[in-house]
Amino acid sequence: MSKKVLVFGGTGYQGGSVVRELLKDDSFKVITLSRNPESEKCKELKKLGADVIKCDESQPKEEIEKVMKGCDCVYLVTNSQGYCEKEIEYGIKVADVALKCGVKHFIFSTVPGPNKLSNGKFKSPDLDNKVEIEQHIRQLSKSNPEFISSFVIAPWYFQNFINYYQPEKESSTSDKYILKWACDPKVSLDYGDIDELGLLVREIFKNPIKFSGETVPFSSEILTPIQIVEIISKVTNKKVSYQFIDPVEYGKSYDLEVSLMLAFFNEYGGFNIYGGDRSIAHNIKKLTSFEEYLKKINYKLD
């Protein structure tokens, strides 16, 4: 008998990967939520076999409960952008409804929390909010052992270097490029093709007892910014250099939330601070490297 899985954020990077991967397996029936079920992304998911229902985590408990009744499993990824202080409220609400509805296995996409790990030296709402939600879910499982919870940590997406952190030309007439970012050039962080996250989530859903209470990191490669520009140079056959921008200045000119994250990671590093076994994802399937990803999408610098 197939497990009925409710996936939040099915039109986003993480949720979309989870939906697509679960739909490849006949042992899962997938439902996902959207504020606009008639969007092109939702239509694509419907074609693959997903049920798309008009709802999201901002809806009242009663509405979420209607959708969640009868579900065996839930995958929750929360969104700080647009919600901010509401993210914690929404995440806790979804977990509480899942317990009430008899959900057997709940997977939450969490992150290392700067405020907790640095004893208040660093703070990042985008990261710290998720830690509070994780702690609430863990307490629910502790008080209700039949409510199994597991956690995944997503890395910095390879996709970010296509959509957000693009190398720029040194000048309008130059054939040389610069990647400007706030990650210390000597700091190694975890990266991956987020389209492959669903592989790991499917494995966890298939083995609830094994992964009960576990935090499992998804990481294809551990790279420094210098290694990143070297790979971009190799694939594009263009000269790409790296320019470190202090996180404080980066936050003023580019992206405040990213600057807060990187200020923390520059001092504390990647997933090592959180623990967890990176090899689990690698043992499921050979994961795509950054070089392979760029070649796969035919990445170019114009």
Swiss-Prot record:
- Check the record and name the SUPFAM superfamilies matching this protein: NAD(P)-binding Rossmann-fold domains
Q: Which CDD domains match?
A: NmrA_like_SDR_a (cd05251)
Keyword Cell inner membrane, does the record have it?
no
Instruction: State the GO CC annotations.
Output: nucleus
Pfam families linked to this entry: NmrA
Query: Which keywords are on file for this protein?
Result: NADP
Which residues does NADP(+) bind? 9-14, 35-39, 56-57, 78-80, 130, 157-160
Highest taxon, organism lineage:
Eukaryota
Q: Give the Gene3D superfamilies listed for this entry.
A: NAD(P)-binding Rossmann-like Domain (3.40.50.720), UDP-galactose 4-epimerase, domain 1 (3.90.25.10)
UniProt keyword NADP, yes or no: yes
Function comment: May be a redox sensor protein.
| Family to which the UniProt record says this protein belongs | Belongs to the NmrA-type oxidoreductase family.
Identification of the protein by name: NmrA-like family domain-containing protein DDB_G0286605
